[in-house]
A protein has these predicted regions:
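Substrate-binding groove of N-acetylhexosamine-processing glycoside hydrolases
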Residues: 1-152
């Protein structure tokens, strides 16, 4: 049995703690900062409580905090991008990039983490490459979203 811990919004770390207490391996999928269909700023039915930016992920992701416990029962982390709420293929890149890069950093990098300012600068330096490759790079931070920006 492997437990997928995902309902952070409803029960915080309860499922994670119970799984570890009973010696079950866990995959962290907290529904805060890992659902990439959530936009950076409010849009359609996504209120401010269901938005997040690169900084939120990098500094506040409950799944990342769990992985950093270095408990051998914590197997890793997942993220999701649900398209059942009107998110079309055309909209996907702006939700994935650059936020997926923070999640990849948390999932795979084992060295000392950069502070957020330096990480953000590294992301901005790579933006042009992503755009040249045909990816639509969305705003990284809420403060970068220009008035009138459309998520669709």
């Amino acid at each position: 049995i492997v437990i997928q811990w995902w309902n952070y919004r409803g029960h915080k770390e309860l499922a994670l703690q119970n799984a570890i207490k009973h010696h079950y391996p866990v995959i962290c999928s907290s529904n805060y900062y890992t659902y990439l269909n959530f936009p950076v700023t409010p849009w359609r039915g996504y209120t401010n409580t269901r938005t997040f930016d690169l900084k939120d992920i990098y500094q506040n992701n409950p799944s990342d905090k769990a992985i950093n416990q270095k408990d051998p029962l914590i197997l890793g982390m997942t993220c999701a991008l649900w398209t059942d709420d009107g998110v079309t293929e055309r909209m996907i890149d702006r939700r994935l990039f650059p936020r997926i890069l923070a999640l990849a950093e948390q999932m795979w990098y084992q060295g000392e983490r950069l502070d957020f300012t330096r990480f953000h600068q590294n992301i901005l330096q790579r933006k042009e490459w992503f755009e040249q490759m045909g990816f639509e790079f969305g705003p990284a931070l809420k403060s970068e979203v220009k008035k009138g920006y459309q998520w669709d």
